[in-house]
Amino acid sequence: MKTRIIVDSTADLVPEVQKRVHIVPLTVHFGQEEYVDGVTIDHKAFYEKLIESDVLPTTSQATPNDFAVEFEKAKEAGEAAIVITLASKFSGTCQSAMIAAGNYENIYVIDSTSVAMGSGILVELALRLLDEGKSTKEAVQILEEEKKKIVVVALLDTLEYLKRGGRISKAVAFAGGVLKIKPVLSVTDGEIHLLGKARGSKMGNNLLVQEINNVGGIDFGKPILLGYSGISDALLLKYIEDSRPIWSGRLEKIRYTTVGSVIGTHAGPGAVVVAFFKN
């Protein structure tokens, strides 16, 4: 039986991967205005609106019916499906997928325990496993183990958006705001951790490199993806240059993409993100 990959729209993917999967969108709200993530608003338009608007956007999870629509398509095509969602600790989207899956056979829901590029690299690994001829169940079993090794580290321009979205405490946000320092965060096992605070992007970039080393380094045999939030990729390109010893001779090409609307709502513009499987 052929297997398709279904993901929610918070998984940040490069175009060639995006073409191979089926996406269930979440919803972004600017006040009374409602947008379907990746459908009625693209990343560029979202960040332009985020920067210009006085209204903090909010997000809504995908519903069981949203997933059921995709599951029905898989059923009609005679295909099994592996469903990869953002961390259940961040959103009820995973729960929605599980509720919908209860009405279908051969649907396997995986809580990525990650977000953005972290979910994205798990999707890439899923496609790789299927391309290698793994069965649906074999692929699911491997993915459930490998997701424990996903590390996402991010240098944010500010903690303000995370605070306003209720993702971190006001005390942590205040600490990040002192002297306009840039916070370095990690996402592991569905939780956000403040790793350190840097005065300026260069020190922040050094902290990102330090955290990669702290977790034991990168498994270069598995997918790696970098990302940025906002309209310009200049900060990310500066990070790549500053951290060149990590990548030199190990990657033919450093791949990166933009952080999508839903996660961008909480990260704000000006973030640099690195997602990888640790050794």
Where on the chain are the PLM-derived regions?
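Mixed-charge interfacial surface used for oligomerization/domain docking
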Residues: 3-4, 10-18, 22-27, 32-33, ...
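Short beta->alpha junction loops
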Residues: 60-61, 111-113
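Short active-site oxyanion
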Residues: 1-4, 80
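Conserved residues at beta->alpha junctions
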Residues: 85-88, 113, 230
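Class I S-adenosyl-L-methionine
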Residues: 35-103
